[in-house]
């Protein structure tokens, strides 16, 4: 008829329509005109359907229950146990995760003293921080309790533990609540503690305070206590510190028998020993003097009691989840905190700067010609705009050395840096052709100080096709607007394909909406993992430059991300490593995919540049092709944004294990899915992926470091 151990000893019945005995009880209840039935089951079921992620079908199929509250003369329709808890506790997530909630449900908590203890017990029940509550208090509600105990005039004269249990039953009829309405005594304390994991002591009797702690210490049960003045909370971890002195040793070797029957005034010296009179608020300390004079009881405020309840609830959660919590005491002093109010700092990144627009312009040309070529080289793109090169301009040559100190976890085996070196050399060739000094280029992977070195020997070449790209090269930029998909003319497709081939690479364009959307899903999932991998997250955030940052000559200016003010605030949150660590711990963060998914899906085409070969020279050759395609695409009215999934330069599972150990398996699956989509061929290696779309010019352009002359190394 009733669910075992659920509803406790409050007299509540949980009944179901498909149980014969329960149906008989329900029929009797319905026949009683003094009993009201309330059925809002459909509204509760709608709450189940709203759950995210979508609940299992069996949760929706749980049979309706009826909870009978005899003290209210009411029967209320409720969801089944699983559905009820899922909906009621849903707003706890992820402050308390579903897994943590299940762990806490195994916790058995006792509360002694249900004046201040009422708020604590109710808070624990509301948070779902335990599966069983055991409440003990012999006292009855008086009118003077109503300044702090959340009950009403209808409850005056009723047992405090019973009233607390009833409120909790109305909150959660499935929560097991055991009552001890006779209070505690030396004879009953062991029975009360039996099976408890935590006990919270909020009683007035000093002898019971001592006896309870002595028994809890013997059983290894931790004791928590909140004292309302200045938010004092005591933690005594007898479970991890066997034999720890009770009350932290503040009472010495006290005899509990001598504390029995003391008047309120006689308790004051002992209370002051426990609370440390020097730490009491002035109002509380002065009130102690007035006990039995102008006051007959301890003064307490409801707000202070609820502060204590919140603090104790946090302590219970820590114990239940095995999180760090030492013995000791702390004050959560709201009054003192309000004395330390600060003016909030003005936002350093307000909305005004979002409106700034800095269109790209071709810079004035420096002299001599070798420096013109060098300045063109450093305008090349690179991952995170880290500019992983050293450029040495001499009278008869230009050398671009890969700078290994600028590598990152995603720059696997320097392949991304090699692509950047190749792009820089392409720019140099374009500038050299425009100034009629184009010469031969050679790549060298044998130098001890650099994994790759590219050198152009100036000559008298003036390749017209390269020279024609000079101004478009100077105006090339990354465009991160959301953009709009549009038609890419077949002639443009052919031109871009031939442009890549002229540099010894292959270009593939995904043009169908289905292919683009599939790629968007894969690339977005990889970007989520980039956020959730600690090292990758740290490196990604270190690349961002916010207005007011000391140096904007490297990295990515956040204005170039083309985010609105709300998106920028979210990005500001995502800069915090502790935030993304929590998302990773919970295996959440699907919202981190949205930006990439939406932008890639808004593309006119997705371009992939390949090389057939895996040396750094091959990747540099691919970088030249990538840069050529980028310049020509922009020249023909297309906006370009590179996409760099973590797996871009990975050649096997080992590379992915190094880049993101926890998510390597997922990344490997994503890489396989992407290659299944694009089919690069057995020898094909991706150099870069970028989206082509239609959009206005970027708000700002990435800057470059000021180039200083770099001497030749000693040989």
Curated annotation (Swiss-Prot):
GO terms for molecular function: oxidoreductase activity; tRNA threonylcarbamoyladenosine dehydratase; ubiquitin-like modifier activating enzyme activity. GO terms for biological process: cyclic threonylcarbamoyladenosine biosynthetic process. Transmembrane segments: none annotated. Pfam families: ThiF. One of its GO terms (cellular component) is plasma membrane. It comes from the Bacteria. CDD domains: E1_enzyme_family (cd01483). NCBIfam families: PRK07877.1. This is Uncharacterized protein Rv1355c. It comes from Mycobacterium tuberculosis (strain ATCC 25618 / H37Rv).
């Amino acid at each position: 008829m009733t669910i075992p151990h659920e509803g406790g000893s409050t007299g509540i019945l949980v009944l179901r329509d498909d149980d014969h005995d329960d149906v008989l009880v329900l029929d009797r209840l319905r026949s009683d005109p003094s009993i009201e039935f309330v059925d809002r089951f459909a509204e509760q079921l709608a709450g189940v359907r709203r759950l995210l992620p979508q609940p299992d079908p069996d949760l929706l199929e749980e049979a309706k229950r009826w909870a009978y509250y005899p003290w209210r003369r009411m029967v209320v329709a409720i969801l089944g146990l699983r559905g009820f808890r899922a909906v009621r506790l849903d707003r706890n997530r992820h402050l308390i995760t579903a897994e943590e909630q299940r762990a806490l449900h195994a916790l058995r908590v006792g509360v002694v003293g249900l004046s201040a203890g009422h708020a604590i017990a109710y808070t624990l029940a509301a948070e779902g921080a335990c599966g069983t509550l055991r409440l003990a208090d012999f006292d009855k509600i008086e009118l003077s309790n109503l300044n702090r105990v959340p009950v009403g005039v209808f409850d005056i004269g009723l047992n405090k533990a019973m009233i607390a249990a009833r409120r909790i039953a109305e909150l959660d009829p499935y929560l097991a609540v055991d009552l001890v309405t006779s209070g505690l005594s030396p004879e009953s304390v062991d029975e009360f503690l039996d099976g408890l994991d935590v006990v919270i002591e909020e009683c007035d009797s000093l002898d019971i305070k001592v006896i309870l702690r002595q028994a809890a210490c013997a059983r290894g049960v931790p004791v928590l206590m909140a004292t309302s003045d200045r938010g004092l909370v005591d933690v005594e971890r007898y479970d991890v510190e066997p034999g720890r002195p009770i009350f932290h040793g503040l009472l010495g070797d006290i005899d509990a028998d001598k504390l029995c029957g003391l008047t309120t005034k006689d308790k004051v010296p002992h209370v002051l020993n426990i609370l440390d009179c020097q730490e009491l608020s002035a109002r509380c300390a002065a009130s102690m003097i007035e006990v039995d004079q102008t006051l007959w009881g301890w003064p307490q405020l409801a707000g202070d009691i609820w502060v204590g309840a919140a603090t104790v609830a946090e302590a219970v959660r820590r114990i239940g989840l095995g999180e760090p919590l030492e013995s000791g005491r702390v004050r959560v002093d709201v009054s003192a905190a309000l004395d330390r109010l600060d003016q909030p700092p003005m936002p350093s990144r307000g909305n005004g700067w979002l409106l700034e627009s800095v269109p790209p312009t071709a810079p004035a040309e420096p002299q001599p010609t070798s420096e013109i070529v060098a300045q063109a080289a450093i305008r090349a793109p690179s991952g995170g705009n880290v500019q992983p090169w050293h450029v040495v301009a001499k009278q008869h040559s230009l050398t671009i050395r890969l700078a290994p100190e600028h590598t990152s976890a995603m720059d696997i085996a320097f392949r991304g840096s090699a692509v950047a070196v190749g792009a820089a050399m392409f720019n140099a060739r374009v500038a050299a052709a425009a100034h009629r000094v184009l010469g031969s280029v050679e790549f060298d992977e044998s130098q001890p100080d650099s994994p790759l070195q590219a050198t152009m020997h100036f000559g008298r070449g003036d390749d017209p096709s390269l020279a024609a790209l000079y101004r478009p090269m100077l105006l090339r930029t990354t465009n991160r607007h959301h953009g709009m998909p549009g038609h890419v003319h077949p002639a443009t497709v052919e031109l871009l394909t031939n442009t890549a081939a002229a540099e010894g690479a292959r270009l593939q364009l995904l043009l169908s909406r289905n292919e683009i959307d599939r790629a968007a899903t894969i690339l977005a999932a990889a970007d989520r993992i980039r956020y959730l991998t600690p090292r990758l997250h740290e490196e990604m955030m270190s690349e961002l430059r916010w207005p007011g940052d000391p140096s904007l000559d490297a990295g990515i200016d956040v204005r170039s991300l083309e985010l609105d003010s709300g998106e920028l605030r979210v990005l500001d949150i995502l800069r915090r490593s502790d935030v993304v660590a929590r998302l990773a711990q919970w295996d959440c963060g699907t919202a981190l995919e949205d930006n990439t998914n939406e932008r890639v899906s808004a593309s006119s085409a997705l371009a992939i540049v390949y090389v057939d070969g895996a040396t750094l020279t091959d990747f540099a050759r691919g970088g030249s092709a990538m840069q050529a395609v980028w310049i020509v695409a922009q020249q023909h009215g297309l906006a370009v944004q590179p996409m760099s999934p973590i797996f871009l330069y990975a050649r096997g599972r080992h590379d992915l294990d190094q880049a993101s150990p926890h998510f390597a398996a997922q990344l490997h699956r994503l890489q396989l899915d992407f290659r299944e989509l694009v089919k690069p061929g057995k020898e094909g290696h991706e150099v870069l992926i970028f989206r082509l779309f239609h959009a206005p010019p970027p708000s700002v352009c990435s800057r470059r470091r000021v180039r200083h002359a770099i001497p030749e190394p000693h040989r």
